[in-house]
Amino acid sequence: MRLSSLGEATAGSAAPAVVCGSRTDLYIACSCTEGQCSRADSMALNERGMQMDRGQARPAVRQPDERERKQRLVNRCFRESRVPDSESSPGTERRTAELSGFYTTKKLRSLYWTLRTDASLTAFAVAQERDTILISNRHHSEENLKLYQYDNVKSKLRRIQTITLPGGSVVACALPGPGFNVVMGEALRRTHDQLILTGHEDAVVNLIATSLEEGDARIIRRFNPAKYLRRLRAQYGDEAADMPWLQEIDSLRVRQLTPWRSVKTDATGFIALVNELIFIYTFDDTREPLYMHHFPGVESFDVNPENELLLALSGSKYGANGISLLDLTKMRGIGRQYAPAGHLKAFERAADSKHCLWLDKSLLVNSVGNILRVWDIRCSTGLKCEVLGHKSNITAVRYHKNSHTLYSCDEDGYIFSWELSHLLRELEGMTDVRRMTLCRSPQSIKTADDCSTTIQCGNIVVAPDTEFSSKRNSSVRSSSSRLGRLHLQFLGDGTLITLDALELGVHKVQDAKCYIAPSKNKLRRHSELPIKTLAPSAVSHAVESDSSLSSDSTLVERAQLEELHHDIFGSGFMSLDLHAEVDHS
């Protein structure tokens, strides 16, 4: 029998109907057989309701008002929330959303894979165009390059190929983008689509061409800075004795590799930091570098994103701030080197800066101990503000341009993210910003003057899990010194990739629903939205008890973790046993 409205049967109805109601005078009509109700969650018969004989006129049923309809919807959602997930009705999620039982926020999803303890990691690089990850490790006497591709949809790593290299150990590597493939020639480009740069302990740099699907890797160029320096030493003759950097040829080592391309000449090549020497090679000439000079105390460099002839240098011989600029416009001699006014002369107060990084064409950042300093090369003073929050020396710095987010990590294993969009807007307004701190930190705003000079924009991305690390023996932890520091890289969509001697991590910020738990008061449960309570949060273990260095995490379901529990790295890696996915608030 079909009901057209509450309590009114359509014409031609033959079966008797039962009017079901609650003691709150809410009436619900259903097509039940006489004497029983087929609804599992039906309410008791209204004390005033009577079973109607066939053909007997029904009493008029009062239509519920807006308040009663809303109350009925709440009660129905509450009853359905106690039904198992497999038996809940499809409309439950829609009605839950209508009642605002959750709110959407941003959370960090982290995946980890444990690395094999008998393989020494030596280098790490990422190609953002194809989400390709390159890891170099040394297993016994073999030097292997392993290429992986990350699937963001399935959250899995697929191993593409393994390349075994001759010669010394790989200590630096890079993955040039598709724009550099012109060096392979037309014939080779038909079968090969990826270039790999590798720097070795004996200062040799190899350019490798490979196919991501078919393999067939081959070395197409080999650069030997040591051989060039030997020829240079022979040319100088007796004068070479006054050049200490020419006496260190036998101990040369590649420390940093960066693909390089000239906009004016369209030449492609790379910049290499070999000991304290900076080399610029083009792929067309393997014998003579385009540029070479010795910079005492240099630790790292970075190329300006809009001017390939402007380099930032950081080191221990650049005064109190450890930062310098190198202009190679003329490509003759040393070029022009700049530093903040008078700072190059202050060697007695020289700072040891390990990292430098361009944020855009005019802003750059460098690290000095546990402090990050932001510089504006358009200003005479240069220094704009300091980034405070780390309690140990900073070991790596990376910047994601699209999201205006700066990432930094320290020796304790903390990774912080700094939202620089606030700073960029403040700089455009030429306000007096002096400090950037964590959102919750003892170094936050303390006085009224701090409101105009301090920006709170830092968040904890990853905190060290001391309980997990303590399970590893001391010999494993000591092997982390082989890698030197925690490496940070990005995929094309901004997903953060971290690598140290123990594990590979993939971290991505995504939207997450946070459900509102119902009240524990039984007398109020019928009037509140009943939503299934989530499992208790798991708190990541921090090194210190400082509240600013602790973060909440939510573990995912066991079924999702079991899908990740497999050997994904082959002979070089093994899967992590259940701390695989963690959401950091």
Swiss-Prot record:
* Gene responsible for this protein: DSE1
Identification of the protein by name: Protein DSE1
Which GO CC annotations does the UniProt entry carry?
cortical actin cytoskeleton
One term of GO molecular function: actin filament binding
**Similarity comment text for this entry:** Belongs to the WD repeat DSE1 family.
WD repeats by residue range:
179-218, 346-385, 389-428
PANTHER family assigned to the protein according to its UniProt record, in alphabetical order: WD REPEAT-CONTAINING PROTEIN 1, WD-REPEATCONTAINING PROTEIN WDR1
Q: Which organism is it from?
A: Eremothecium gossypii (strain ATCC 10895 / CBS 109.51 / FGSC 9923 / NRRL Y-1056)
Task: Tell me any Pfam family this protein matches.
Answer: WD40
Q: Which InterPro entries match?
A: WD40/YVTN_repeat-like_dom_sf (IPR015943), WD40_repeat_CS (IPR019775), WD40_repeat_dom_sf (IPR036322), WD40_rpt (IPR001680)
Q: Where is this region: Disordered?
A: 50-71
User: In its UniProt record, which GO terms are filed under biological process?
Assistant: actin filament depolymerization; cell division; cell wall organization
Keywords, alphabetical: Cell cycle, Cell division, Cell wall biogenesis/degradation, Repeat, WD repeat
**What is the annotated role of this protein in its UniProt record?**
Involved in cell wall metabolism and required for the separation of the mother and daughter cells.
